[in-house]
Structures are given as structure tokens and as C-alpha cells.
Amino acid sequence: MMEYFYRIYGLRVQSQIPFSEAVPETAGEAEVKIVFGRMPDFLLEAGQKGYGTWTNGFVSAWFRIRDGTQVYVEGGSRITVELSEEPQLLVITSLLLSAGMALVCLQRGEPFFHGSALYTGEQAILLCGESGAGKS
């Protein structure tokens, strides 16, 4: 299987999934790995109950995308992706770069801001706040 290396949020990421939006990086020791695989057995119950998300504090987290693809983020160093029968790759890559990598940063103890940004040529402003605060 093809392996890709990127620099994402300052971390060297080794991925089995290509990201056209990410900055390519030379091969080397990865701080984060994104791999295809099966979800851990203990998450079967969450999926059967119809849950869409599950967390174990800042140690691990799981979420299901609308197309049925499942993502498990653990230890701030690994993202496992189990594709659905009809995966929507654009949605999957977008959520891996946003929610997936945000969970990696949180699990690593990195500060992470929930915000919206505006860019006007030479200047930018970042609006941060809790969900529902009106940043959109």
C-alpha cells in the first residue's frame, strides 16, 4: 500500500490516504500515522447502539461519518480509518484534517482553538470561542 508523508499542524504524518491539501514531507520517523484498519472490538457496542461519537477522556476517541466510515484516534499518534461500502473520500479527507488531527493535538496536550478565520489579502483575523458563540 502506498505511503504518503506530510507536515500537518507541525507534525510529520505518515498516511495511507493522500491529502492534496497537505504540505508534502520527506519520509522519516512519523509522529502520527493514518492507517486503514478495523475498529477495536469494544467499539462495536457503540456502533450497534447508533452512537456517532465516543471518547475516553483525552486518550482516545471514535467517530462515524455520515457515509458510515469510522475513525478511531488514539494516543495522539494514530488514526485508524475503516471505510464504509460507499466512502465519500472528499468528506473523509476533510474530516481527518480537521476533527481527526484536532483530536490528535488534544491528545498530545497541544493547545487547539475552535475558530473562524478571515483573510483580506495581507491581513487576517481569527475569531475564537466556544461552539455556538457566533464565529460563523
Located regions from the model:
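A noncatalytic interaction/capping subdomain that flanks phosphate/NTP-handling catalytic cores
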Residues: 1-130
